[in-house]
A protein has these predicted regions:
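Feature activates predominantly on carbohydrate-active enzymes
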Residues: 1-109, 116, 122-140
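Long alpha-helical, hydrophobic tracts
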Residues: 63, 104, 146, 154-155
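Short acidic/histidine-rich active-site segments
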Residues: 84, 142-149
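Glycine- and acidic
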Residues: 106-111, 148-152
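Conserved small/polar residues in nucleotide/adenosyl-binding loops
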Residues: 179-183
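Helix C-cap/helix->beta junction micro-motif
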Residues: 76, 173-174
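Active-site cleft segment of glycoside hydrolase catalytic domains centered on the general acid/base Glu
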Residues: 147-166
Length: 183
């Protein structure tokens, strides 16, 4: 709940910790859900008008709540870095729109070879980054970009192009993009 995040920021401020990365989406491991992606728990925790029905029903933040949270954290000198984790850990997105899921690597991975994947993720990021008063208030945004397959050269190159695309998209809104370098 938001009250937990607010308490966490207060504790961080007390100990002079100044950065909190908030994962807005993630999912469980399918082996704990009968090896079935359809049963595997996944959630996206931020209100979305672009994709009605995407937002988790068992706990989420309204846009206003999240904006207020970021601004309040800033008064305590704590920067909130929102993360929309793509192209892996994306089961919440593929539960919502199954056709963008990877059949080869698992439904918690976006299919990097489908144009609809880019359209979906572009629109999602734009919803939170565009305008004079964007939902993501700070300058830094995290996009995940880790734990995707490196087994095939064509997939690695597509992953590189995918990452480059989102670097340009996020930075095009004047934000600094953060991502986790794949190992």
């Amino acid at each position: 709940p938001m009250s937990y995040l607010q308490d966490l920021v207060n504790i961080m401020a007390y100990y002079k910790m100044n950065t909190l990365q908030v994962h807005l989406n993630d999912n469980g491991f399918k082996q704990y859900f009968d090896n079935n992606w359809d049963k595997t728990y996944a959630a996206f925790r931020l209100e979305s008008e672009t994709y009605p029905g995407l937002t988790a029903r068992d706990g989420s933040y309204s846009k206003k709540e999240f904006i207020d949270f970021q601004k309040q954290a800033a008064t305590n000198f704590v920067e909130i870095i929102p993360e929309i984790d793509i192209p892996a850990h994306s089961l919440a997105f593929t539960h919502y729109k199954p056709e963008i899921g990877s059949k080869e690597y698992g439904m918690d991975h976006l299919d990097l070879f489908k144009p609809e994947t880019y359209q979906f993720a572009d629109n999602l990021f734009k919803e939170y980054l565009k305008g004079d008063d964007p939902v993501f208030v700070g300058k830094r945004v995290h996009i995940g970009t880790y734990e995707y397959s490196n087994a095939k050269k064509e997939v690695v190159e597509k992953f590189r192009a995918f990452t480059d695309h989102y670097i340009r998209l996020v930075e095009g809104f004047g934000n600094c993009l953060l991502y986790t370098s794949p190992s």
